[in-house]
Amino acid sequence: MDIGIVSMRYAKALMEYAKSMGAEDTLYKEFCMLDRSFRKHPDLRMALENPILTIREKLTLICTAAVGDAPAGREFARFMTLVLKNRRENFLQYICLSFLDLYRKDKHSFRKYNP
């Protein structure tokens, strides 16, 4: 299946869920940091594609990349668990970018979050 289609489906579903929970701003910050981690550490993507790592190990890696030592938000952790259980971790960077784009369009904010 096309990377863009899959990524946008997950991003749209996440955006709807985030709005229903009132967590879109928190998720935006977490995804900005995750995007920054993907750009700063290209090996992060390779690690997530490693079949030897368990879902739990990958989830820990993703959460650390997104929030550091702080605990990840409930919505973020639930979404990442879904992505990992569905074996879509190879799409994660694209899902991340799609979500950030949807958020900015929804909030009419075109400036980038720079943590």
Sequence positions of predicted segments:
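Elongated, mostly alpha-helical coiled-coil "stalk/stator" tethers of large membrane protein machines
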Residues: 1-115
